[in-house]
Amino acid sequence: MERSPYSNTLLFNRNTKLSLSIGLLLLFPALVQGADSLYDQQILQARQGQYAPFLSYLQQYQLRHALTPSQVADWLQVALWAGQDDEVVKVWRRYQVYMPLPARGTAAAAQALRNQKQWQASLTLWQQALSQAPDSDDYRIGYIKTLADARKDGEALSEARRLVAEQASVAHLQTLSYVYLRLGKSWDQLLVDTQILDREPQNKAALASLMATLTRNRIDSPALGLANSVELTPAEKRNLQLNAAAELVRLADTPSREENARYALARTALAQYDAMIAAWHPDPQAAPDIIRARIDRLGALYANADYAQVIREYQNLIAQQQTVPDWAIGWVISSYIALKQIEPALTLIHQHPSWLTSQQNEEHELFYALLDTGQYPAAQQYVARFTRNAPYIRRLYGSPTPQPNDDWLTAQSLNVHYLAATNALPQAEARMQRLAATAPGNQGLQIDYAALLQDRGLPRAAESQLKAAESLEPASLQLERQQAWVALDLQEWRQMDLLTDDVVARSPRDLNTQRLARAREVHHLSDLRLSVGKGLHSDNPVSGTHDLSFETAIYSPPLADSWRLFGGHRFAEGNFEEGKGSRRQLFAGVEWRPRDYWGELELSSVNFHGENKPGVRLSAAHDVSDRWQLGGELERISQQTPLRALRNGVSANRGEGWLRWYQNERREYRVSVAASRFTDRNRRQEYTLSGKERLWQTPWLTLDLQPGLSASANSRTDTAYYSPARDLAATAALAVDHTLYQRYDTVWSQQLLAGGGSYWQKNHAAGAITVLGYGQRLRWNNVVDTGVMLNWDKRPYDGKRENNLAITLDANIRF
């Protein structure tokens, strides 16, 4: 039987020493008079822990003399004290045939058989001992403990409780504690051990038992607090210190705690580990404990969000040929994922597949990392595997009523996120709306539904959804984060700052919080906008040949939340039959961006036809709702004035009004009406209808139909620039957007445009329009968005089809 310094497994052995000594004194009066006989001297030595002299003496003595039952009982008890269980059983079997032995001898044999795990034989002897001495507490206790060892749980617990009910002494409570230990009821055992210590605060055995029970229940700091009251080996003391530090790591890694409290616990644990490792380093016996401390320390580093240090320490352990167990590898995997190093994380997951189903993967960070890196098949397999193991209901042992399965709800949520990330937003919204409607008290689902509405370009609907969810838990971090994202889309700058400040103060190291803080940081950066167009081959009368145009504009960081200053330069030139035409424009202005509104006022100096003229532009837009937006623009010396007109000294003032209807990311239309007044007294009206219809999508590709209808009328046709009396164009194009590479905030994609239509001009026959285009685009780190596009089109001008091949470059850089 296992002997533990924390378990009272051999209570009979120790408690019966005193009773044996008293019995021996009564049996041998000479001992009382001075203990002058050799036998009596050996008995006294055995009482003091020197068992060998007595056992050796008795071995020789029994060869020359017949032993009395009392002497055999002495032999059995001293051999039991010496831990010679085989000898006890052997002597018992030899002498119990010839003589009736005293109860104490029978009990010694019963204990030896118990130590040998011969439970049934031991129980039989305990019953025999109790029949000889029915009032013996020691024998009754030994019998109950053996019942517990034999896994006769019901009988052992019943007898132990009866014993305590008769008298709640320390010995009886210790017996009940032992039964609870064998039954695995560690919390019940903790209660009993606490009661024992309340009765005898200085009881060393009770202190040791309580310390062991606290350790089994992972209440390690109080267990360490008892260490100075109990005699422990250095290894046992180190184990308690490690357990106490590990308790801090577990507490720090609990998501339900406030972030500041978690980081404080993590820093405390790190300080303890550093102190322990430094103190134990000179001791070679402590080498295994140092390795354990270093492995446990990975959890403290992870809880402290020191992900890079987690990886460095893990690599050091591997370099030293140390094995990191499965229960610790999750910290390393999560650290790799947090640092956006998914490849080594996947390698470790392949080596430790049990991590996928462990509690360390409750946040499903691997799934979101797969989505962020465009590994959609792997993400789909992740969802499918999780869903297979998450039925709608689960049955709990002992309960006749099926219970809802939280894992099923998590699986549905993961599936919605997968659909949203793979461009299947209608299906994602339908599922999330159903989940949110059937669980109105689940704030997480309401927030996820709002996020999905925002992804579909409906921030006001998302705001309303979040407002309803606010009543459930107003101070929720997840809620405030999503409200900040929506406020950013709605241009609620002050609200966004307040929410972000609060979220950052409460969870500064949370990755989702850092992402939000990064978005706000980008919002407060300056903005450089650049666009360049170059005609490679063109013979049309609008742009001329070898045309070149570019525009640069720099916007300041936000001022007083809604204002930005801007300034820049525009240039355009082209070759025409009558010579080269050019336009240069320096401009500066102010932008206004409160909620639901946008406006720009621009003042400029325009150089064309050898002279400078002042220009003014006023642009405005109003978001009536998520669906409707209207706007307009007034401009003196309009940018839409044909370059050829400027070449010939003709400029135009222009006014435009437009209305946009937006259903979601799959459908939108825009209609505009514009009127231009040229200085040569020409009056132009323009009407445009354009739209987008999503036809097809995959995780990496979208296919859109872009219909267009435009018409114009000019009051004069005898102009130096292209000015048809009436014209009408109807086109339809297919636009493909294909993601070539995606890794977190870096996305590289290619675009393909192919379309055609018909063009009608008054006094000329209708002609075909053909449009082709190919381009690529790169978005990097939320601060660079740039693309290049090669376009070719062929359409009629005054009845003659002309070609135009051009390349355009645009960039938006935040700095």
Predicted regions, residues:
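Extracellular cysteine-rich, disulfide-bonded domains and loops characteristic of secreted proteins
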Residues: 79, 113-116
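Gram-negative bacterial Sec-dependent N-terminal signal peptides
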Residues: 2-33
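Disordered, low-complexity tails and leader-like regions
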Residues: 1-7, 51, 513
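Gram-negative and organellar
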Residues: 58, 68-70, 74-77, 85, ...
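Short linear motifs centered on Gly/Pro in flexible linkers and helix caps
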Residues: 4, 9-11, 36, 70, ...
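N-terminal leader/linker segments that initiate helical-solenoid repeat arrays
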Residues: 31-75, 81, 90, 104
